[in-house]
Amino acid sequence: MAVPKIVLFYVFTPLADPEAIRLWQYTLAEAHDLTGRILVSEHGINATVGGDIRDVKRYVKGTRSYAPFKDADIKWSDGLGNDFPRLSVKVRPEIVTFGAPGELKVDADGVVGGGTHLAPEEVHRLVEGRGDDVVFFDGRNGFEAEIGRFRDAVVPDVSTTRDFVHELDSGKYDHLKDKAVVTYCTGGVRCEVLSSLMRSRGFGEVYQLDGGIVRYGEAFGDTGLWEGSLYVFDKRMTIEFSDQAKTLGRCTRCGGPTSRYENLPDDRGRELVLVCAGCTENRAG
């Protein structure tokens, strides 16, 4: 019986021949019937793929056989089967698109000048010791935070990661430059870049949640500082860490609580919108 699984991982490391890595990764993933998205650049690799657990394990083993990727932090989650429409493996200037490839520096140890990594338990100790001096800073697209975020987090007004550079340069967050800023995102890759951009712009004490929201949820579920659901970029669209998850989102039709996204146009021209099950049923009827 097939057991669908999804893995998420990234590695920042210099890659002299991204095209060779792309061909190898495509061949490896295709050989094991995986689907998903893999981005490769001179700065490293960023991948989310899914398939049967046995095939995914073989892919992970093969990927880790390449020395620069041997310590990749692989984040596992349950899939639905056919979670991605196809396999896409591409070379891009950036493995996460901030529109600032020239600002990012990496070496064999990862991003140069990024924020200090904190495990979920270390984040709790920081908050317990520093209180209101600690600020959570959301490193995701704005719509993702509509259904889940850290308590009292700063959520920048961004539609894509390309908007972050302008947001940081606007000065609207300069009052945080003397705070302890904890950046967070889904699996950690966006905060690797975001934290380095913040540090280069004068934010003095910048951290990043190691392993992202995924690792935090594994450690604390819904008993810690995270509230709501987590948006994911596959067929599932959202996941919860327990049945105690709060519902933060609001239906764009009736205003009722929901964490349910649908691909529908709305009056703002956005296709991905929050729509509760009741409104979907009423529309269908």
UniProtKB/Swiss-Prot annotation:
GO terms for biological process: tRNA modification. Its EC number is 1.14.-.-. It catalyses: uridine(34) in tRNA + AH2 + O2 = 5-hydroxyuridine(34) in tRNA + A + H2O. The active site is at residue 185. Disulfide bonds: none annotated. InterPro entries: Rhodanese-like_dom, Rhodanese-like_dom_sf, Rhodanese_C, TrhO, TRHO_N. PROSITE patterns: RHODANESE_3. Keywords: Oxidoreductase, tRNA processing. It comes from the Bacteria. CDD domains: RHOD_YceA. Residues 130-225 form the Rhodanese domain. One of its GO terms (molecular function) is oxidoreductase activity, acting on paired donors, with incorporation or reduction of molecular oxygen. Belongs to the TrhO family. Catalyzes oxygen-dependent 5-hydroxyuridine (ho5U) modification at position 34 in tRNAs. This is tRNA uridine(34) hydroxylase. The lineage of its organism: Bacteria, Bacillati, Actinomycetota, Actinomycetes, Mycobacteriales. The gene is trhO.
